[in-house]
Amino acid sequence: MSLYTTIHLHNVAAGRAEDYARWFDGAHQQDLARLRGFRSADRYEVTPQQIMPDIPQPWRFLSVYEFDYAAPEIDLPALAPLLAQARDAGLIDDSDESERIHSYAMYSDWVASPNHRADQPFSGVSIILANFVAGREAEYHHWYDTVHGPEVTRVPGKVAMKRGRLSPLQVEPRRYCPGSDLVFCAQQTDDLLFTVKDFSARARGVSPSGVAFQPRSSAGSFARTVHYFARASGTRFWPGGIAYDGDLSVYPADFARPAG
């Protein structure tokens, strides 16, 4: 079996947001359940809080489709007609040709940290459309697996990570993807600003926790974009608080207060 994740980055036609949500949680989920290897489908909405606030966020919504395929070359294309239903019904705003559907062969399933509360859903996710430096792929993966993945998922509110490679198997519309790899992180927090600020603080070595990230590997390319989203589908939502297997009392009360 092969784990695949397909991400659908999209915007919704004006006045059709409720129609799209109703379709996604209703008929679309029923159709997906009939596909071989289907595991889950969730939808998320872009958040005001971003770790790279100056980069464009071209998409308001992200849908994530998880599969465990026996024969990806046969089963992955079956997703295309289901995604086309939204386009055919006029639910997608692709007037600027920003819609993107990218499928990835995952290196592993979720790798969770001690922060993770397995009995609760994710509050949101972040994706990195990532690249490694040419000739240094093995070093890049080793750094992520042994250093960066574990340190990232121990940030308060961050709970799990998995990564994958852009698959040669894609569904329409097949459009440019700026990264060869997907870095997919899960959050469980009701204070994303806190999580984002402490991520940045740990990267700079100034976190009130005293925890500092290891130096960034030069095998990781700076040609990447990061996008944060909050859960926008289903019936179960994160109940509140910040998932953290540590002491939040070391953080000042105003740590996550917006500047100004």
Please report, for each region that a protein language model flagged, where it lies by residue:
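Macromolecular interaction modules
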Residues: 1-260
